[in-house]
From Swiss-Prot:
Protein name according to UniProt: Shedu protein SduA
GO molecular function: nuclease activity
Keywords for this protein: Antiviral defense, Hydrolase, Nuclease
Lineage, uppermost ranks: Bacteria, Bacillati, Bacillota, Bacilli, Bacillales
InterPro entries, alphabetized: SduA_C, SduA_N
Length: 380
């Protein structure tokens, strides 16, 4: 049997649970499908269900066999369902666990699963339930992988108790050094992804994913602190998480003023200038770059126009709007500065982006150069 119970609510007083398999052949099986219920007349009677005979269909999935209509049985007809002692024991044990689930959790809204028959997992869950701040801190992007590796190292070591005692006795300075080493490892991992993909990967989704997993990189662009509000945020719909309207790749905000920052992501291969001269020594910005600039400015205009509607609809749905539109910043991340091999190329690009009043243009290699700078700073 599985070590967890899957639960899906069907109403506020009932939830169907995963099937309990009692008998099985290569083509048929008998299952019991339990439900946990809120029984107001008899609170202890909190589990019900039905036996289902299934056959394996052409798609290799289990299909319910035809249902019998008891009302059509004649006086001399009868139906017998027999299960052996092993199946009865399985059913009894599993049903008792479902009673325990209802007693502890009741009927909760949504779909979820609960672990069973594992006291170690139960202890872990109880620990985090009593200290939710600890769980939140451990699952932060920059700590979860380090936590996993540290735990694996401890439990596979011959003397885990000694390791834990040593960690407990570390001085504050030693802990700071340990945190620094973990931070450097994460920075180098991101830098490795950049070096491996910068010349070959032309997928916008890939680079959006890299920056989404490492949102702190984007924060390096700004002199003021910023926090991520949402990725692929809708700026022209009912809420910033709506399924229609315009969407910007990343929506950041200043944590103090809440002023919005809109970031549009292209790829390292995005051309920055045209290959041919406009005039002698003068090159125009490439249409892919100017298009991205126009796009993010359009998002800004739409957001400013729709902000009141977004805020109102968020309020109606109980969602807090975590950003404002005082003077929203716009950023485009595209191309690589290293591709501008000629002096005239670099001058034309710099003239273009420096004269943009409302949009900051930064290249991918400039962005990841800041990651290199952080590594050098931490390594001393």
């Amino acid at each position: 049997m599985s070590d967890k119970i899957n639960v899906w609510t069907t109403s506020r007083d009932s939830a169907v649970c995963g099937d309990i398999e009692l008998k099985k052949t290569s083509t048929t099986r008998l299952i019991f499908r339990p439900e946990i219920v809120n029984n107001n007349k008899n609170p202890k009677a909190s589990v019900r269900g039905c036996f289902i005979f299934q056959k394996k269909g052409r798609n290799a999935l289990w299909d319910d066999y035809k249902e019998l209509d008891m009302n059509k049985l004649k006086a001399e007809e009868w139906i017998k369902l027999e299960i052996n002692s092993d199946a009865m024991l399985t059913l009894t044990k599993e049903i008792q666990k479902h009673y325990a689930v209802h007693e502890k959790y009741g009927v909760r809204y949504g779909a979820f699963h609960l672990f069973k028959d594992n006291p170690d997992i139960e202890k872990l869950i109880e620990m985090f339930e009593s200290n939710t701040d600890l769980l939140t801190q451990l699952m932060e992007d920059d700590k979860s992988e380090a936590l996993e590796k540290t735990l694996e190292w401890i439990v596979t070591n011959d003397n885990p108790d000694k390791i834990i005692d040593r960690l407990k006795n570390l001085k504050e300075q030693d802990l700071d050094q340990l945190n620094t080493l973990i931070g450097i490892a994460n920075l180098k991992k991101v830098l490795s992804v950049w070096e491996s993909n910068k010349l070959t990967n032309t997928s916008e989704k890939f680079w959006q994913s890299v920056l989404k997993e490492n949102t702190w990189i984007l924060s390096q662009i700004f002199s003021n602190p910023t926090v991520l509000i949402n990725d692929e945020a809708y700026v022209g719909g009912k809420t910033v998480k709506n399924d229609s309207g315009k969407l910007v790749d990343f929506l950041y905000a200043n944590p103090f003023s809440k002023d919005a920052v809109l970031i549009e992501i292209k790829t390292p291969s995005t051309p920055l200038i045209t290959p041919t001269e406009y005039r002698t020594g003068v090159y125009s910005a490439h249409k892919d770059l100017t298009g991205a600039v126009t796009q993010v400015l359009t998002y800004k205009t739409t957001l400013q126009r729709e902000y009141q509607n977004i805020d109102y609809n968020n309020y109606r749905q109980g969602i807090k709007t975590d950003f404002d539109i005082i003077t929203p910043c716009c950023v485009v991340i595209a191309g690589m500065f290293d591709t501008l091999t000629d002096t005239a190329h670099r001058h034309s690009f710099e003239l273009y982006r420096k004269e943009l009043k409302n949009v900051t243009v930064i290249t991918f290699d400039e962005l990841f150069e800041r990651v290199k700078g952080l590594i050098k700073l931490l390594e001393g």
